[in-house]
Amino acid sequence: LFRSLIGIKGTRGVGKTTFLLQYAKEKFGTDRSCLFINMNNFYFSGHSIVDFAYEFQRRGGKVLLIDQVFKHPDWSKELRLCYDRFPNLKIVFTGSSVMRLKEENLELRDIVKSYNLRGFSFREYLNLQTGMKFRSYSLEEILSNHEQIAKGILSKVRPLDHFQDYMHHGFYPFFLEKRNFSENLLKTMNMMVEVDILLIKQIELKYLSKIKKLLYFLAVDGPKAPNVSQLANDIQTSRATVMNYIKYLADARLINMVYPKGEEFPKKPSKIMMHNSNLMYSIYPVKVDEQDVLETFFANTMWKDHKVNKGDKNISFMVDEVMPFKICQEGMRIKNNPGVTYALHKAEI
């Protein structure tokens, strides 16, 4: 840790708490100069972060790991005070992806380094399941050398044997737990709406059912442009409120908003997709279209390091505004266009 204030954001369920605990174990072991605290603890209902940090560093504390920091009132002001008063104390805190860390907390804008923790990529999932250590490749490397890369991987494992399992349950780390994954994910999704969105955006509880209903309608409709007027009528609220709710769901990493090149929120997106394919199987498993799943996987994978826009006719996505991609399920007829890159399902090389 080179900075004294670091924020770890990420959607609920991707392993932020585990990340902090692993860091403490690997870097400090039983050394008590590093301490993990959770703002869910009732102790912090009657004590401030600043007072706790003062006492901790007075007793030799050097690194304070704070989980779910947004559960504490005035957390951003208190972190600023800690930063100013205890220059030798390093603080790492976790928060929800719904938090607009720098935009909505001006006192932290210039002093906090923010990172986003994502769910597992297919490569990470494959490594976990097979014990391999495949390295990551940039998009440029894959486009220029995909045959050699694929041959190297296929000499060790057959990725297609694991791909459908990843699409169904491989994005969130809790698939490793020996519990019902879908039930666990549904609970996590409910927590995203009930805690992350309502608490952080300070929305009254009576509107919870409207947000849940909106998420359900968006999921069932599949990837397409939302009919905002119809959705407003369905959940009995205004068009402006529907658009705000859609933005909150996107911030919570429950959906992705895909725009044409040059457009962004608050304009209506040209396509709304679930954030990852695991969500599709949990929220409405009886209506999961393979082409929709493949496009959701591609968009989610690209979003980490690239800009993703809706493509023109016969193009699924435009990546980084210059690379057109067409996502093709098995058996789909392809009109070979040399200017388009085709992502083919079940084509090993």
Where are these regions (language model features)?
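Conserved catalytic cores of phosphodiester-cleaving nucleases, focusing on short active-site segments
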Residues: 298, 302, 315-333
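Short glycine-rich substrate-engagement loop in P-loop NTPases that contacts/grips substrate
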Residues: 31-63
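Hydrophobic anchor at the beta1->P-loop junction of P-loop NTPases
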Residues: 5-8
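Conserved lysine of the Walker
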Residues: 16-17
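Structural recognition of the conserved hydrophobic beta-strand(s) that form the central parallel beta-sheet
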Residues: 65, 90-96, 116
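Interdomain motor-coupling "hinge/lid" segment immediately C-terminal to the ATP-binding subdomain
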Residues: 96, 102-209, 215
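Accessory nucleic acid-recognition modules appended to NTPase machines
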Residues: 174-313
